[in-house]
A protein has these predicted regions:
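PRPP-associated nucleotide enzymes
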Residues: 1-193
Length: 193
């Protein structure tokens, strides 16, 4: 039988493209458990709507939700500010809007990564206009030193250097999302310098 048959095979198939692993699978799970505990404590006695920003946040949101000990509902938005590039364009387009009416709900926006903050600022303004009872952000990753707008982020997993990263929901050209860790790519894998 040919092809990829296990996660280990998949990871090995992409190994030539990986420069280095920044955050291991175990480190991610430990951090998500910690974030889940904080969220559970902060929203004790309440129901919470998790809003995932597609496509990258689906992996983070699925695992984070397993660590939150509250009644949860789920919804998704799809936005684009990258296209096929490795840096955000700053122009945000909503490709898929929410199914829920947010008015009066406690909402936690789940992001895979915060880069410049421009997309997140746009989303927060858009969602706040829908009058939720509360609106906070949980992001697995935040790139340091490149934010163009100040943002108050309540739940942050890891601060990372301003490098292009893949894995754990993050992609390059729709590849690498299901790697169980966060890694950098070799420049030749994406045409970087």
């Amino acid at each position: 039988m040919t092809g990829v048959s296990t996660l280990t095979d998949y990871v090995q198939a992409y190994e030539p493209d990986i420069e280095r692993v920044l955050i291991s699978s175990d480190e991610i799970q430990s951090k998500l458990a910690e974030m889940g505990d904080r969220i559970s404590s902060d929203y004790e006695g309440k129901s919470l709507l998790l809003v995932g920003v597609l496509k990258g946040a689906f992996v983070v949101m699925a695992d984070l939700a397993r660590y939150v000990r509250l009644p949860l509902e789920f919804d998704f938005m799809a936005v684009s500010s990258y296209g096929a590039a490795t840096k955000t364009s700053g122009v945000v387009r909503i490709l898929k809007d929410l199914d829920h009416d947010l008015e009066g709900l406690d909402v936690l926006l789940v992001e895979d990564i915060v880069d410049s903050g421009l997309t997140l600022k746009y989303l927060l303004k858009n969602l706040a206009a829908r009058k939720p009872a509360s609106l906070e952000v949980a992001a697995l990753l935040r790139k340091t030193g490149i934010q163009k707008v100040p943002l108050d982020l309540r739940y942050i997993g890891f601060d990372i250097p301003p490098e292009f990263v893949v894995g754990y929901g993050l992609d390059y050209a729709e590849r690498f999302r299901n790697l169980p860790y966060v890694a950098t790519l070799k420049p030749e894998a994406y045409g970087g310098a």
